[in-house]
């Protein structure tokens, strides 16, 4: 009986060792739009930590806001034999060919936060981006229900920027139609870069003799650039301005009263969930979707998370409570 038990233990041990030796390490290629932006640095760190805790290996590259660089980096990841591509696209309109290459190699593709259009991607995870725009516009009209509004969109090649604008206009249109709000300018900010937003805002102030009451800025980086221009004219804190991403600089401006609000998208939840989905895809599993979104080619299984309005009154109950920022940093 003892010999039988010993043999059984040995066989079980050998079997487990053999399974462990052949357990698949999922290789993930993470292609990021632009790591110069604080937002994506946080996503990367959280995603990599979670994916590695699930036994995956992650290769990260940043395109620094260049679509050709991103396509080249994705091709490089395909050649490295990754199992899954997680792509935060700079331009979601131009990646259909590299996605096709990936699919031909049996690689799964997850679009992270931004949709990839006209491509055979496997899954999409993001936030309800029209809702983001609605939160931005509503926060401003609650404070400035009439006056001159300037619309500062994000990158013209970012699909999300268009969704934010759709949400913004859903709120603003009745005010515009009634004549309460006048849109005195509408421009998109290349690369979401604050230096581009600064120039746009300077020109807008000049064109309107500084008579701007609210700026619908689509994220904190562009809000920061716009606020620089407003400050130079003595208008900082006097013009209502929105944001998004809950960047530390944006939260500091809200606390100081120079920025009205930001939209907090719980990035920890987004990145952790995306890592879980990527590993599931790499293991041949089918992640759970809560909806589908059409990208021009197919209805893509998707998971959309809920964004949160952050203002001076709820900083502690949102970004501080979640550990996204520390109170000592403010």
Curated annotation (Swiss-Prot):
One Pfam family this sequence matches: Peripla_BP_4
Subcellular location: Periplasm
GO function terms (MF aspect): carbohydrate binding; monosaccharide binding
Superkingdom of this protein's organism: Bacteria
NCBIfam families per the UniProt record, alphabetical: PRK10355.1, xylF
Membership in a protein family: Belongs to the bacterial solute-binding protein 2 family.
Name this protein carries in UniProt: D-xylose-binding periplasmic protein
Organism: Escherichia coli (strain K12)
Lineage per the UniProt record: Bacteria, Pseudomonadati, Pseudomonadota, Gammaproteobacteria, Enterobacterales
Gene name in the database record: xylF
């Amino acid at each position: 009986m003892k010999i039988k038990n010993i043999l059984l233990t040995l066989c079980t041990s050998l079997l487990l060792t053999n399974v462990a030796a052949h357990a698949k390490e999922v290789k993930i290629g993470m292609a990021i739009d632009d790591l110069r932006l604080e937002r994506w640095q946080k996503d990367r760190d959280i995603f990599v930590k979670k994916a590695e805790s699930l036994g995956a290996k992650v290769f990260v590259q940043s395109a620094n806001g260049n679509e050709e660089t991103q396509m080249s980096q994705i091709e490089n990841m395909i050649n490295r034999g990754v199992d899954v591509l997680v792509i935060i696209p700079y331009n979601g309109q131009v990646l259909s060919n590299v996605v096709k290459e990936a699919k031909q190699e049996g690689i799964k593709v997850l679009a992270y936060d931004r949709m990839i259009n006209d491509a055979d991607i496997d899954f999409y995870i993001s936030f309800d981006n029209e809702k983001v725009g609605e939160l931005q516009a509503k926060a401003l009209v609650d404070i400035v229900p009439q006056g001159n509004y300037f619309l500062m969109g994000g990158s013209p090649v970012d699909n999300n920027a268009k969704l934010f604008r759709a949400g913004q206009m859903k709120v603003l249109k009745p005010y515009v139609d009634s004549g309460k709000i006048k849109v005195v300018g509408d421009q998109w900010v290349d690369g979401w870069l604050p230096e581009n937003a600064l120039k746009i805002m300077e020109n807008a102030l000049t064109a309107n003799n500084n008579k701007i009451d609210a700026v619908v800025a689509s994220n904190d980086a562009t809000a920061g650039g716009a606020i620089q221009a407003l400050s130079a004219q003595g208008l900082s804190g006097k013009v209502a301005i929105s944001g998004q991403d809950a960047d530390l600089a944006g939260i500091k401006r809200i606390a100081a009263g120079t920025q009205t609000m930001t939209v907090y998208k719980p990035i920890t939840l987004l990145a952790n969930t995306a890592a879980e989905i990527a590993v599931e895809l790499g293991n041949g599993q089918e992640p759970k979707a809560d909806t589908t979104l059409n990208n021009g080619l197919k209805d893509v299984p998707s998971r959309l998370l809920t964004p949160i309005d952050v203002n001076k009154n709820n900083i502690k109950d949102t970004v501080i409570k979640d550990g996204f920022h520390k109170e000592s940093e403010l």
